[in-house]
Amino acid sequence: MDARTGALNLGNLEMIYELHGKIPQNSSFVYSEDVLTSTIFGNLRYLNSNSVLNSFLLKAIDFQNNNFNFEFSKDLKFHFWRKYSSKTTVQINEPDLILEDENSVLIIECKYHSFLDETFSENKSEYTNQLLRYSTIINDYYSNKKNKNIIFLTLKDYEVKECLEKTRMKLPEKIGLYWLKWEELYSCLKEYEKCNISTGEKNLVNDILQFLSIRKLKYFSGINISKNNFSWKYKRNYKYKFASKFDSFTWRYNYE
């Protein structure tokens, strides 16, 4: 058993409490983006492959609707809430997550129910925010990396256009800026679930899927009915049976 597989149970512990309804709905734990960040990414790192993480990140888009197109190697490092002192100011910056391999660095700022920290001067001529401050971390500490990017991770309904436009205008061109939605992860895990993975991984993936469902962090697929979806069958003794087949389930009704 390799180190990542051996750590599955340990990495899974922090969300078991919530999956079994042990957390009050009004608890600050439920609304904490730090808890969400550590639960999701803390558990993804224990999968034997980075394929789920990479497929999730590939769903991030920039202002031209181009997808994030860098995949991390197996030698990926996760840095949670690491503190960085600026080399030009006295400010300390603490990104939610930094992903790093030999050639790439990615800073992920995770939001759940809070907003991006923005600062304006009195006459609003000067503007900065968390993402811009994090770009100085890349310049100061990761300038040797070939691929340098920032992802803003939010709920699907988060209004990002204005703040990201302001950010892109002031961000160095060599640093990519992307937007990603928490809801995109669910389908990535469902695809991975179909692969030939170990029992431990299946259990972990299932737990994360349940967690995302509880938090309502998945897209509603909806139901679309057309007359072509219905089939009628006549059975003896005046029993009629019809079925409607949808993408995700089959609904049946029997009338006698």
Which residues make up each language-model segment?
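Charged, terminal alpha-helix-loop-beta segments
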Residues: 1-256
